């Protein structure tokens, strides 16, 4: 068990975006988190990564309480994440995006950095080679020297994943990785995610596109900020409540 | 990955430095031409008249801009008048004075730069001006480089004029002159005034000028109500200060130095707040301006010691001519003079040069400080200031005292506003 | 408590009220433009100054009726607003550095232009209304009363304009979501030009009134500008109602602080107070969301 | 802020040749600058150069803070702070001007750090405004200290760095200081620190998600910027002998950002060129007396409308234009 969310609640001025959420994530699994628009999936991510503070409840990562820590602290502990919208540094090249995402392992202190000591140079060389590897992994190697903002949507999303991998996460939160992609982009992405999880990274996916289910070991369905059901993709597909929850809601991207 | 396009940036750096090079080459050229040289001109006199360049330091831009543009015009008129009376005679040779004007941008460092330009670029040996406290930027420099410096005004702040600035003279009535004039008149004509409030701009002069004023007021037998009220020159509304003045419960308030805007506004606000206390304004701005700001109904029961203005009997024929020429220049038949703050020093300079019969600043300063009486645009003036400045180098002359009732200024008398 | 003190307190209260209304009057155009259109007009002070000078010129040199002169000044400066929108704001929308550069350029031209052209004469627009208004021991000049009334009524008018009229609603729509507004068929350029016209007109109105209350200098806009920014940020971005309260706070501080401390220290203390307020309420008193 | 160049020297051989051209260029420029006193004998022109050097340090440090997305409108006030601290220390306390110079820089840095902790929460516009207010307040505060700072009239006859009246030693020392400061700032910008600042500027959300502490780096940026502007202020005070608040007032604050913006915020050379051009051109036209400001205004308009990314973008524009001419294929893109 790598992540344990218990009783997590977030109220935005009265109405509860997330209420009494209990989820446990096991080591090395791929957990799907699905639900219609406004179900509170992204809010949940922001709560886990400390972008917003929960009203109550706790988030425990590897037996360590990380509730309400600052985002960069949580990142240092090894939780990487991607963003739905503009997930990158638009004015850096693709490679620079990944390089500048290497902040934690290795990290050179200010002294080394300023005086360009061997330590710093060693680290940067290592980082460069690592970055190129990651770009190979997510299949962005060929566009590595182009400005990130000029890349197609799918590439930008993949770059988001690459950046998240750069912090060597043990837990990776992917926020709608395939939203707005065309079919073969989707296939590439799913391939990349599979490869990533084979590296032993635990993954939580937020998606309200059912297609993603096929790579999940376990799926949690939430609606109105609450967990409806939980189970294997197969069970979920048959579950009447899920069908019901999905009937009303369109498939366009969340807010 | 591409390195920053530094060759390109460098080309532009070189480009910029080339531009700079050109521009400054231009500067040097002008320098060589405007340096105190001998360009011969033919006039009525027998021998050819040479020209001698005098530096004028004015704040042509910034918040003093429009004001100093006017005073520089006066200065030019004064120069013309000196030249038309045969210029100055040094070593039997007639010289016409020629002004080279530099802009101090109404900032202290701008003034320093301008002074540097006058001294090192225009190579002048005599500097007139600048205005107000900006002298502090010039006096030290002139002392260092042995340049004769005749200030156009003085707010008595450190560095402007003291025992160490032996080359600096005060050629024009300053805040201290106007104050002494007003105080003397007040003492003589308003026996029932016992307590006075003091108001002045809080431009840093309070610890110096303010302290001196307070001493003089007490020496004259008045009690100062409360502490000195320092107002912010750039306040939007002066009524808080007015309220503060009224709250002191003094018989009279003396507004020392400052310009028409704050003084007039305070007068207006004091009256609007329902107080009719005696209001004494002592600064160079003329009564009519103060009335303009304060409004006719509000400006009453006011004593004003100011520069000469339209309506006061002219002390000297020169001043009459000055006024006529100025009105001709601005094309307004009843335009008032501003303050002559540069014209007066120039007029005096002509006098001093003739006396000293030399252009050497060292000689000039000795002659100047040893003159018993000097010819100013306001008539004969005296040289004093040992008690106030530590050096005997401040010119003082008679100033007009005016009373204002219901917006009508009435000239009272000429006060010999001596600097102690 | 001695009578002098009581008088002082009463006077301060009156001053605070009047000064606040002045500041509201000054800040209205600026805050309107920023809150509704997200346009930061750093040249507001200079425009205010120009309005004052036009009114002065028409009223004295031309000898026109004062109120008529004011109206013409307002109209003329309003037209200048179109120019501003087209050449200063539209090309550089959202880039604060470039807006500052352009605005400084405009300020330099206007201020020095006036300074050079007017020469040195102390200039005051004759008072719009004469006389002093007395109630018991309190006495104010009618001028200040008029400024007070005009300031408040203009605020109300602007609020009505924003909330009730079609154009006002369109402006808010544009400010909130440009693309949406365009899709709705709103003529964005027209709307923003209208906003600039209104803002500049308000500035000119303030200028003409204040020009008769204070005397005119080419640089009268500079200190005003800081006040106006204080009021904007204090009131909170995206809220016109904030102007009322921010104006009250700034005005009261300006009316009371000079009585306690002397001269320039007032400004320092004032800034300190404002910064502290803003650190506790970073969005300003009535701020909704951050923009700019 | 557009970002160019690589964070690390890519380990391929031809970078050495790549680095050679700028190196030569730098050498040329430095030699040119070193020769200036030999070309221009007039102390007045040296005076202008010296002031330019001081303002270049100030503008460059301001731009460094701006790379992190903060617009420090208080920067001119910090210049003033540095100037006043070193002036007071060397005049009233009697420290050696050199020591005062360093202390001024350190004090300025400390104040910068102190304010940037509370201000680090604020986003772009609010930061700009609050720093503007802080600048005004700081200056007014200094002004209101009475005899210590001499109010509006400022401090005069400040002890100078050299006893000699000549300006040549000042020029060389300040040139050296400027080059060192710029080198340090450039190093900061080109190493990971600078890149993290740019990352924060582009998206503080994303940068925090990879472990960049926004507060830490914003504070670092302000600290470094304020240190150098404090140094510049100290140099200014001890060279210029007289200082007054009017030199650092609101107009000055806005002009400072103009130095940066006209030169170009996207490039390290921007503030250098911008300052050189904008400070010296009006001096050249100072013969126009009260009409001089119109010249600077004209320059502003010309630059901002012609090259909105500043003067440094000129070569790039020329190059792209040239390439467009060459490749007629993609005329429709861009």
Model-derived segments and spans:
Chain A
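Glycine-rich phosphate-binding loops of nucleotide-dependent enzymes
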Residues: 1-255
């Amino acid at each position: 068990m790598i992540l344990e969310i218990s009783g997590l609640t977030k109220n935005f001025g009265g109405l509860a975006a997330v209420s009494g959420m209990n989820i446990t994530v096991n080591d090395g699994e791929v957990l799907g988190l699905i639900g219609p628009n406004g179900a509170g999936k992204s809010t949940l991510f922001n709560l886990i990564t400390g972008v917003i503070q929960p009203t109550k409840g706790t988030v425990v990562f590897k037996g360590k309480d990380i509730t309400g820590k600052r985002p960069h602290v949580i990142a240092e502990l090894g939780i990487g994440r991607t963003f739905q919208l503009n997930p990158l540094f638009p004015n850096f090249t693709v490679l620079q995006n990944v390089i500048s995402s290497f902040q934690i392992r290795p990290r050179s202190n200010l002294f080394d950095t300023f005086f360009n000591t061997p330590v710093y140079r060693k680290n940067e060389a290592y980082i460069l080679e690592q970055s190129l590897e990651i770009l190979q992994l997510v299949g962005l190697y060929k566009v590595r020297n182009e400005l990130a903002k000029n890349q197609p949507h799918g590439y930008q999303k993949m770059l988001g994943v690459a950046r998240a991998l750069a912090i060597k996460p043990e837990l990776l939160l992917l926020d709608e990785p395939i939203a707005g992609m065309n079919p073969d982009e989707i296939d590439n992405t799913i391939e990349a995610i599979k490869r990533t999880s084979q590296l032993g990274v635990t993954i939580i996916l937020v998606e309200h596109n059912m297609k993603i289910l096929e790579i999940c070991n376990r799926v949690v369905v939430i609606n109105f900020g609450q967990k409806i059901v939980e189970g294997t993709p197969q069970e979920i597909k048959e579950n009447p409540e899920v069908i019901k929850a999905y009937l009303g809601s369109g498939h366009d991207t969340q807010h | 990955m591409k390195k920053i396009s530094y060759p390109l940036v460098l080309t532009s750096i070189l480009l910029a430095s080339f531009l700079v090079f050109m521009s400054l080459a231009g500067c040097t050229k002008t320098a060589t031409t405007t340096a105190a040289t001998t360009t011969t001109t033919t006039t009525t006199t027998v021998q050819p008249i040479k020209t001698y360049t005098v530096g004028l330091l004015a704040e042509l831009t910034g918040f003093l801009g429009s004001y100093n543009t006017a005073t520089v015009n006066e200065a030019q008129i004064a120069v013309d008048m000196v030249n038309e009376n045969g210029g100055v005679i040094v070593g039997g040779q007639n010289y016409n004075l020629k002004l080279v004007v530099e802009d101090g941008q109404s900032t202290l460092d701008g003034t320093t730069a301008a002074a540097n330009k006058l001294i090192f670029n225009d190579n002048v040996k005599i500097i007139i001006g600048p205005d107000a406290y900006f002298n502090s930027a010039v006096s030290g420099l002139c002392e260092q480089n042995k340049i004769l410096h005749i200030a156009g005004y003085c707010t008595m702040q450190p560095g402007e004029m003291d025992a160490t600035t032996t080359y600096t003279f005060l050629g024009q009535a300053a805040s201290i002159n106007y104050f002494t004039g007003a105080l003397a008149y007040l003492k003589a004509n308003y026996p029932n005034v016992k307590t006075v409030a003091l108001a002045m701009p809080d431009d840093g002069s309070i610890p110096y000028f303010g302290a001196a004023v307070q001493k003089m007021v007490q020496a004259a037998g008045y009690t100062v109500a409360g502490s000195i009220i320092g107002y912010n020159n750039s306040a939007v509304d002066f009524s808080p200060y007015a309220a503060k003045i009224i709250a002191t419960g003094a018989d009279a308030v003396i507004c020392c130095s400052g310009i028409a805007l704050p003084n007039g506004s305070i007068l207006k606000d004091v009256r609007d707040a329902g107080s009719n206390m005696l209001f004494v304004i002592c600064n160079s701005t003329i009564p009519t301006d103060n009335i303009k700001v304060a409004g006719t109904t509000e400006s009453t029961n006011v004593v004003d010691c100011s520069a000469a203005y339209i309506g006061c009997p002219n002390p000297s024929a020169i001043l009459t001519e000055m006024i006529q020429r100025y009105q001709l220049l601005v094309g307004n038949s009843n335009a008032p003079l501003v303050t002559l703050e540069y014209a007066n020093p120039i007029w005096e300079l002509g006098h001093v040069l003739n006396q000293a019969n030399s252009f050497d600043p060292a000689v000039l300063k000795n002659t100047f400080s040893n003159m018993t009486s000097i010819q100013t645009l306001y008539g004969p003036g005296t040289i004093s200031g040992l008690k106030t400045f530590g050096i005997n180098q401040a010119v003082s002359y008679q100033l007009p005292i005016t009373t204002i009732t219901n917006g009508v200024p009435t000239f009272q008398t000429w006060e010999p506003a001596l600097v102690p | 408590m001695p009578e002098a003190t009581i008088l002082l307190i009463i006077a301060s209260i009156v001053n605070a009220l009047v000064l606040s209304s002045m500041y509201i009057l000054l800040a209205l155009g600026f805050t309107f433009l920023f809150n509704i259109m997200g346009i930061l007009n750093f040249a507001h002070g200079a425009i205010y100054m120009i309005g004052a000078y036009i009114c002065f010129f028409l009223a004295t040199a031309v000898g026109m009726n004062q109120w008529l002169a004011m109206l013409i000044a307002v109209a003329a400066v309003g037209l200048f607003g179109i120019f501003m929108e087209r050449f200063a704001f539209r090309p550089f929308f959202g880039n604060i550095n470039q807006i500052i550069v352009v605005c400084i350029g405009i300020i330099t031209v206007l201020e020095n232009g006036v300074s050079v052209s007017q020469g040195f004469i102390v200039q005051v627009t004759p008072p719009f209304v004469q006389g002093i208004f007395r109630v018991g021991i309190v006495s104010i000049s009618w001028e200040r009363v008029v400024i007070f009334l005009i300031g408040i009524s203009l605020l109300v008018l602007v609020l009505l304009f924003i909330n009730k009229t079609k154009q006002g609603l369109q402006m808010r729509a544009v400010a909130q979501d440009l693309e949406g507004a365009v899709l709705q068929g709103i003529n964005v350029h027209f709307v923003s030009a209208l906003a600039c016209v209104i803002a500049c007109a308000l500035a000119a109105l303030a200028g003409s009134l204040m020009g008769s209350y204070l005397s005119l200098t080419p640089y009268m806009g500079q200190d005003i500008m800081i006040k106006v920014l204080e009021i904007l940020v204090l009131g909170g971005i995206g809220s016109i109602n904030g102007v009322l309260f921010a104006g009250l706070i700034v005005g009261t501080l300006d009316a009371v602080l000079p009585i306690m401390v002397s001269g320039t220290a007032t400004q320092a203390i004032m800034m300190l107070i404002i910064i502290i307020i803003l650190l506790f309420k970073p969005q300003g008193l009535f701020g909704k969301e951050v923009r700019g | 802020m557009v970002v160019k160049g690589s964070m690390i020297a890519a380990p391929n051989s031809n970078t050495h040749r790549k680095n050679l051209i700028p190196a030569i260029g730098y050498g040329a420029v430095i030699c040119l600058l070193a020769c200036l006193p030999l070309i221009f004998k007039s102390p007045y022109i040296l005076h202008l150069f010296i002031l330019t050097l001081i303002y270049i340090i100030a503008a460059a440090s301001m731009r460094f803070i701006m790379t992190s997305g903060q617009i420090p409108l208080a920067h001119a006030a910090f210049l003033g702070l540095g100037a006043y601290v070193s002036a007071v220390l060397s005049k009233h306390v009697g420290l050696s001007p050199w020591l005062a110079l360093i202390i001024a820089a350190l004090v300025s840095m400390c104040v910068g750090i102190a304010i940037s902790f509370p201000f680090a929460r604020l986003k772009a516009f609010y930061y700009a405004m609050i720093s503007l207010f802080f600048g005004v307040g700081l200056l007014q505060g200094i002004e209101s200290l009475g005899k210590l700072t001499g109010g509006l009239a400022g401090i005069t006859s400040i002890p100078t760095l050299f006893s000699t009246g000549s300006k040549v030693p000042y020029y060389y020392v300040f040139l050296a200081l400027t080059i060192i400061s710029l080198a340090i700032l450039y190093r900061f910008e080109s190493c990971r620190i600078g890149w993290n600042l740019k990352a924060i500027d582009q998206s503080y959300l994303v940068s925090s998600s990879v472990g960049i502490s926004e507060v830490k780096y914003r504070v670092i940026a302000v600290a470094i910027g304020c240190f150098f502007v404090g140094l510049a202020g100290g140099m200014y005070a001890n060279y210029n002998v007289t200082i007054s608040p009017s030199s650092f007032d609101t107009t000055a604050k806005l002009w400072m950002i103009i130095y940066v913006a006209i030169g170009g915020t996207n490039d390290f050379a921007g503030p250098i060129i911008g300052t050189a051009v904008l400070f010296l051109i009006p001096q050249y036209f100072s013969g126009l007396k009260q009409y001089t400001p119109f010249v600077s205004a004209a320059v502003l308009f010309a630059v901002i409308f012609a090259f909105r990314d500043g003067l440094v973008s000129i070569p790039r524009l020329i190059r792209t234009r040239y390439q467009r001419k060459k490749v007629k294929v993609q005329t429709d893109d861009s």
